[in-house]
Amino acid sequence: VKDANLVNSLSGKVAGVTINASSSGVGGASKVVMRGTKGIDQSSNALYVIDGVPMFNLSGEGGQEFDSKGASEAIADINPEDIESMSVLTGAAAAALYGSHAANGAIVITTKKGKEGRLSLTVSQNTEFLRPFVTPKFQNSYGTGDLLSSSGSVERSWGNKLNSSNYMGYDPISDFLRTGVVATETVSLSTGTEKNQTYFSASAVNSVGMVPNNDYDRYNFTFRNTTSFLNDKMTLDVSASYIKQKDQNMVNQGTYSNPLVTAYLFPRGDDWNEVKMYERWDTSRNIYTQYWPQGIDTFTGQNPYWIAYRNLRENNKDRYMLSASLNYKILDWLSVSGRVRVDNSNSTYTEKLYATSNTTLTEGSNNGLYGISTTADKQTYADLMLNINKNFGENFTLQANIGASLSDMQQNVLQNRGPISEDGIPNVFNVFQLDDTKTKRTQSGFHDQTQSLFASVELGYKSTYYLTLTGRSDWPSQLAGPNSTQSAFLYPSVGGSVI
């Protein structure tokens, strides 16, 4: 079954690569670790390289103790149907070509392009159904209460022993979770002549999660054209992609506002059907209020359905990628190439906690909480390389790459988040309703640039013995300050292999 996140398709197929799929569901960030974790407090994730150009896989911040915000990532936006092949690059070769970002290894992705011949139209559809496979085990022998008594707690299940007359038969898997569905449709077109090839694809991913009111939608549009000039000595390759994504209530594990916590711990002696109607009309306030007779007690719990339908978190993202590469073959064994790639995205994240949500989560407000943040990511990469691939006699081969690159990354985040003021209107979500004394208005971001020179030389003998030399020097902007004692760092390597 094809996965909507192309990274997950590598699971179990590459030796030494561990892939942990996201607990947030479709669109969530997956962790890829090659040959073990490299550090305690730093990411061990691999670098992704698409058609020879690094893609710096920025991901959103996950949820915190009182903030359930699932995290997505840039690589999860890519349409798996546009992928021609994937390979894994580790060691000094990865670091020499792509810098310190590839210290944990690199996943090299080659995308599809048009093929010479008749017009080809491909239509594919994939539907996946999701149900829990491994779930926690809970006792169902004792009812609501504590210490074998019906008193002491309204949220625990250590009360009197249940029997056939008072056991409600509650099961969180069948009673709360639903069958998830992931539907993927793709249409692709390929056509070309000997001198010009064109590829176009459009794809839609629509997912309904297992947790109620958790949805994910993504739409991809990709265009690529490859043209040869000057008796096939020069090749121009251009591509453009646009991605529109929306996710709602992406679940984050281990937080108090995760609906699974109270769904799992719901007292076995209580009636689940009673709390399915998660809100009641309050005539004194003229609003619907949360119904959760179990209370908050020790783990800041809420009605799971209230969390799903009245603690709303929505993320909307627009992303476009433009790239171009030009290759000129000077001699049969010598060529020069240049590449440039622009990858920009704009995201808007909104958070709406309705009135009577737990006041620990709404920062003390009985009228609700509202948050909105906008994030703009801009990535630009360019490189120029001299490529050598030459045979010397019958026994010796030489492969070398010598070049320079520039990587520029920017991020700007604007955020407004705070409780609705006590004299405000409940459940009216805009920044004018927020309590000025408690609202957090922040602006953050960064602008990093790295300029590099690199070289990789591999000498082969009889297609059996190989000697590899690599070297790279980076000039990162982080070392450009007046107090820096070093403006660049060099990392060379020497390696050998026998096949």
Where are the language model's segments positioned?
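Residues on the lipid-exposed face of transmembrane beta-strands in outer-membrane beta-barrel proteins
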Residues: 111, 187-193, 223-227, 324-328, ...
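Extracytoplasmic/periplasmic beta-strand context in beta-sandwich domains
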Residues: 30-32, 105, 400, 488, ...
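Repeated loop/turn-to-beta-strand initiation elements of outer-membrane beta-barrel proteins
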Residues: 195-198, 232-236, 333-336, 396, ...
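Short, small/polar-rich motifs associated with maturation and membrane association
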Residues: 1-223, 228-229, 234-238, 321, ...
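Extended, hydrophobic alpha-helical segments in both membrane/secreted and soluble proteins
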Residues: 83, 221-223, 338, 382, ...
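Alpha-helical support elements that line or immediately flank enzyme active sites
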Residues: 65-66, 322-328, 342-344
